[in-house]
């Protein structure tokens, strides 16, 4: 049985005051949801603050991005070792905004995936298609290609200790949400494709849905057999919304 995971990606948002208020606002719901894992991925500058805030509750900590490098002359980068030192469990990798705005190729994503695992973190591998790719029936090809790029480097068994997040790019920050049927269709395809490589991995790996998840849509989405939770963007910044999403995962 796969444990539902609700993960908030705060992106480039927050202040010292708002970060504290947000954690305090969601911690009771996170602690009460015994069968749901809750995690947050703050901007790097807030990782130490959040680590202290979640030290005595059940909320897990994640990074939004890390470097493939551990140390050295890499201005502006953050290594997986650094975030691990502050108690992080997860790191996102391959988010569509990293792919789009930072030109991260499948090869770069694969290298980061390996570096994340090698340094004791759990990678949350983000995959998904653009609107143009969906409208030209390329969704399945896109997610397979993005997965294969990682598996070719890491091996299929590495996904036993990883999370996959399917995020249709056309639904991120747009207010558009894939219907529960559309999302389940892609999640089921991902799991079936993985089963061709390893039935063990396919049965075990959590596949999250990411793309304008809201409290109003969470319960129906998470009721689908191959949707194991959500990677939540804007709604993760709102206490009531995020609590509602956690409730929807129970």
From Swiss-Prot:
Binding site residues for substrate: 9-11, 173, 212, 233-234
The protein's annotated pathway: Carbohydrate biosynthesis; gluconeogenesis; Carbohydrate degradation; glycolysis; D-glyceraldehyde 3-phosphate from glycerone phosphate: step 1/1
Signal sequence, start to end: none
UniProt similarity note: Belongs to the triosephosphate isomerase family.
Single biological process term from Gene Ontology: gluconeogenesis
Name under which the protein is recorded: Triosephosphate isomerase
Subunit structure: Homodimer.
């Amino acid at each position: 049985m796969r444990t539902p995971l609700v993960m908030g990606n705060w992106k480039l948002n927050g202040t010292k005051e708002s970060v504290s208020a947000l954690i305090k606002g969601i911690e009771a719901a996170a602690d009460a949801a015994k069968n749901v894992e809750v995690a947050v991925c703050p901007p790097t500058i807030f990782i130490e603050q959040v680590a202290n805030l979640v030290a005595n509750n059940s909320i897990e900590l994640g990074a939004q991005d890390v470097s493939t490098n551990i140390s050295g002359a890499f201005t502006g980068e953050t290594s997986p070792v650094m975030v691990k030192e502050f108690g992080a469990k997860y790191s996102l990798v391959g988010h569509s905004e990293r792919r789009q705005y930072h030109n991260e190729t499948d090869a770069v994503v694969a290298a980061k995936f390996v570096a994340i695992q090698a340094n004791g973190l759990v990678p949350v591998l983000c995959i998904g298609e653009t609107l143009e790719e969906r409208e030209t029936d390329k969704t399945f090809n896109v997610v397979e290609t993005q997965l294969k790029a990682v598996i070719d480097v890491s091996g299929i068994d590495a996904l036993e200790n990883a999370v996959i997040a399917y995020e249709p790019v056309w639904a991120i920050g747009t207010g558009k949400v894939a219907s529960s049927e559309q999302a389940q269709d892609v999640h089921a395809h991902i799991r079936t494709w993985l089963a061709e490589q390893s039935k063990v991995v396919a049965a075990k790996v959590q596949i999250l849905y990411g793309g304008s998840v809201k409290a109003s849509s969470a319960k129906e989405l998470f009721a689908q057999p191959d949707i194991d939770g959500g990677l939540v963007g804007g709604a993760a910044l709102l206490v009531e919304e995020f609590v509602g999403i956690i409730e929807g995962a129970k």
